[in-house]
Amino acid sequence: MSLLDDILQHNKEYVEDQNTGYVDTDTKCSKMPSRQMAIVTCMDTRLVNFLEDSMDIGRGEAKIVKTAGNCITGPFDGVVRSLLVCIYELGVNEIFIIGHHECGMAKTTAKDLTEKMLARGIAPEAIHMVKREMEHWADGFTHPGDNVEETVRSEEH
């Protein structure tokens, strides 16, 4: 059985076990974050079911945007687009940028990524097209704390 098959089977069992009215009538939980907050954080697997508990955040209380190294790489990248929706459509008033120790992005380099991409069959021409951007975000992250400070500075205005 593949990983996808395992996940689909678990999902089927999970849905069958749920209260049938849950999806349509759950008035306790809204798409609008009740604490009017958004968090930009890392996609690190160690943060799953950890970050929210450490901040006393429950289901429906915050919007959480995850990205490698909690990086915002440009004025209209996917993170910024998500934050714009959070602010202007979902009532978010505060944004928290949260990093963590031992972030893998601190050791990631454009050179290493390029080598691994080539080894997996990505065409050199395709890599060349994104080389400058990849160098900007992969080589620009050296320390989690510094990255949080830089991200906050870049988004304050």
Label the predicted regions:
Residues 1-35, 70-79, 87-92, 103-155:
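Divalent-metal-activated hydrolytic enzyme cores
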Residues 40-42, 66-67, 98-100:
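Short beta-strand segments
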Residues 43-46, 101-105:
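Gly/Ser/Thr-rich loops at beta-strand to alpha-helix junctions
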Residues 48-51, 106-108:
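Short glycine-/acidic-enriched loop or helix-start segments at secondary-structure transitions
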Residues 30-46:
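N-terminal low-complexity or amphipathic/hydrophobic leaders
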Residues 3, 58-67:
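Short, basic/glycine-rich phosphate-binding loops at helix/coil junctions
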